[in-house]
Amino acid sequence: RHSKEIESAKKVAEHYHAKHIIVEMDMSFLHSSALTSQDLKVPSHNSASEVKADIPVTYVPARNISMLSLAGLCESEGGDAIYIGANSVDYSGYPDCRPEFFEAFQKVLNVGTKCGVQGSPVKIITPILSMSKAEIVKLATKLGAPLQYTWSCYNGGEKACGHCDSCLLRLKGFAEAGIKDPVEYEGSI
């Protein structure tokens, strides 16, 4: 839907001197999500308390299945793990952000890849899966992570909107951690 996340990922990769590979994954045919369809609007709220726990219109069908299918790329590059920043605590209603999803997909990699059947499967690592947003912010700050390069907003403007579910959960996490968010937001957030 927008290139802002790709720009952010590139900056984070450069910060860590990591290889940055862009894989084209056109999901625009998935018309039921506000993140892939130009016909649906990303919901806007005034506070994180308005974010519902049911499956929202921003759910992209099988998105993490598609992302984790890139285990083949990891295997072909000689890697042994895929790190994914999924989070289930401040749950946004996404079924593919739950521990049982990642456990099931790990079983798929164990039996469905060459390295898996040879006893050394690509491991799915979910380091922040059980952490609150505030815990994530505190850990990232402690580790010196380049939070100024991270992007959570579902919209692709120059500044984060501050009103989509993702922005509100991020802002809540920074507020609860007592740390200023280095990302710029539209208006007076």
Give names to the regions the model predicted.
Residues I84-Y91, P146-G162:
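Mid-to-C-terminal catalytic subdomains of enzymes
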